[in-house]
Amino acid sequence: MTSISTLSNPTAQAEIAEALNQSVAETAVTTMLAQNFHWNVTGMAFGPLHDLFQTIYEDHFTGQDDLAERIKAVGGHAEGMLAGMVSRSKVTEHDGHASDREMISMMLQAQETL
C-alpha cells in the first residue's frame, strides 16, 4: 500500500496516524467489551442484549480494520498488540461479572468515548 501523496508533511502524517491508532485502540477494547458482555449477559433481557452486544462487536471489528488500513495509507504503523491497545485506550476492560443494567451502562460509556 502506498502513502497518500497529498500528505507530504511527515509531522502531519505522524499526528494523523497517532489519532487513528487511538481510535483503533478504543474500538478494539470496546469490541472485546461487547463480546465479553455478549458471552456473559444474563437476566430477563438476555435475548435482545445478547443480540445487541453481538451486533456491536461485529460492527466495531469491521470499523477497527478500516481504521488500521487508513493508518497504513498515511504511512503509519497500526497498533496490533492487545497490550498496546489496552494501555492506550480510554475505554476500560471489564471481567464480565456485571448485571445486565451495568453492562448497558458500561457499553454506553464506551460508545460515548468512541
How should these model regions be labeled?
Residues 9-15, 81, 99:
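General structural signal for secondary-structure boundaries
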Residues 10, 45-54, 93-102:
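Glycine-rich tight-turn/loop motif centered on a GG-T
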Residues 2-8:
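Short, charge-rich amphipathic alpha-helices with coiled-coil/heptad character
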Residues 41-84:
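Conserved alpha-helical segments that form or flank metal/cofactor-binding pockets of metalloenzymes
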